[in-house]
């Protein structure tokens, strides 16, 4: 491994993750024009951000860097595929891994996997409906659209906030940090859908200032303990979201992991799999009609 990579990984273990993220969050919320305009302009240049799809195309018109980062798109920028029964991609990004949940483990990178139960906060009963099911890990790069949408119409059953570290998420840390996604802070949202259980897990990372959902707003840590909120009929008024509807967003972005139960859906064998994807594209079809692809290598 190159020395610069070793140095970067060492810094990941030594850095005060949450302090760095809080400081970045404050800077990203700053509304002083001389500060926020400089941050936005540098970001657009560095990452070659395409503003032509944004509802507000002028990057300096946003009130803060976070407003720019979580910008809305024009109504026709992400048309939803209309294949009956299809599960859609929830976000713009790149599929880093996709496949089956094998013996309660989810593939991370060569030589690394993490536990399904750990990912969902350590509750075996919560994880059981997804055992033997399917997963897709979608990485959102800095230049991507950072709102997360529903792959299927669903009724929210539970939201789980799991505190943790905030390692950077990139190919190097995926190859090198054991159980990366089950160690980083995350918010797991569990839904009931026409194809059975579905979970969307929004994973934080270094400098990810916050994670929001459309029903709870900003999800904040709670005494560094796992916090579960029930939303089913027995607990409070049910929340139903349509297919393609926004369900959450990242302020400075990271990763979304999608989980489905067993024998309901199969991923499409498309050129886009394990590569760039856009929100609204079909990722999976009912098991009887889709074609599976080889296991992750």
From Swiss-Prot:
Its main location: membrane. This is Phosphatidylserine decarboxylase proenzyme. It comes from Bordetella bronchiseptica (strain ATCC BAA-588 / NCTC 13252 / RB50). It comes from the Bacteria. The keyword Lyase applies. It is found in: Cell membrane. Is synthesized initially as an inactive proenzyme. Formation of the active enzyme involves a self-maturation process in which the active site pyruvoyl group is generated from an internal serine residue via an autocatalytic post-translational modification. Two non-identical subunits are generated from the proenzyme in this reaction, and the pyruvate is formed at the N-terminus of the alpha chain, which is derived from the carboxyl end of the proenzyme. It is a peripheral membrane protein. The record marks 253-254 as: Cleavage (non-hydrolytic). One of its GO terms (cellular component) is plasma membrane. Its EC number is 4.1.1.65. The lineage of its organism: Bacteria, Pseudomonadati, Pseudomonadota, Betaproteobacteria, Burkholderiales. One of its GO terms (biological process) is phosphatidylethanolamine biosynthetic process. Pathway: Phospholipid metabolism; phosphatidylethanolamine biosynthesis; phosphatidylethanolamine from CDP-diacylglycerol: step 2/2. It catalyses: a 1,2-diacyl-sn-glycero-3-phospho-L-serine + H(+) = a 1,2-diacyl-sn-glycero-3-phosphoethanolamine + CO2. It is an enzyme of class 4 (lyase). Catalyzes the formation of phosphatidylethanolamine (PtdEtn) from phosphatidylserine (PtdSer). Its cofactor is pyruvate. The modification Pyruvic acid (Ser) is found at residue 254.
């Amino acid at each position: 491994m190159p020395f610069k990579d070793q140095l970067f990984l060492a810094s990941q273990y030594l850095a005060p993750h949450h302090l760095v993220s809080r400081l970045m969050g404050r800077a990203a919320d700053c509304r002083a024009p001389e500060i926020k305009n400089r941050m936005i302009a540098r970001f657009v240049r560095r990452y070659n951000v395409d503003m032509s799809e944004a509802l507000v195309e002028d990057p300096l018109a946003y009130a803060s860097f976070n407003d720019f980062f979580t910008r809305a798109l024009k109504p026709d920028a992400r048309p939803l595929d209309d294949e009956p029964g299809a599960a859609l991609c929830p976000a713009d990004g790149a599929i880093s891994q996709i496949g089956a949940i094998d013996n309660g483990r989810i593939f991370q990178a060569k030589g690394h996997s993490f536990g399904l139960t750990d990912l969902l906060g350590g509750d075996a009963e919560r994880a059981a409906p997804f055992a033997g099911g399917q997963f897709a890990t979608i990485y959102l790069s800095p230049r991507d659209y950072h709102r997360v949408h529903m792959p299927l119409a669903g009724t929210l059953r539970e939201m789980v906030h799991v505190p943790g570290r905030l390692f950077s998420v990139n190919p190097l840390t995926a190859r090198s940090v054991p159980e990366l996604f089950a160690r980083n802070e995350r918010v797991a949202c569990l839904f009931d859908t026409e194809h059975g259980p579905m979970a969307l897990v929004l994973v934080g990372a270094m400098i990810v200032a916050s994670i929001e959902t459309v029903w709870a707003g900003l999800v904040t840590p709670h005494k560094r303990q796992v916090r579960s909120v029930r939303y089913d009929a027995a607990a409070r008024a049910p929340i139903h979201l349509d297919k393609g509807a926004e369900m959450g967003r990242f302020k400075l972005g990271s990763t979304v992991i999608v989980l489905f139960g067993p024998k309901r859906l199969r991923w499409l064998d498309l050129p886009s799999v394990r590569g760039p994807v856009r929100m609204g594209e079909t990722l999976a079809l009912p098991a009887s009609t889709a074609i599976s692809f080889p296991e992750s290598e």
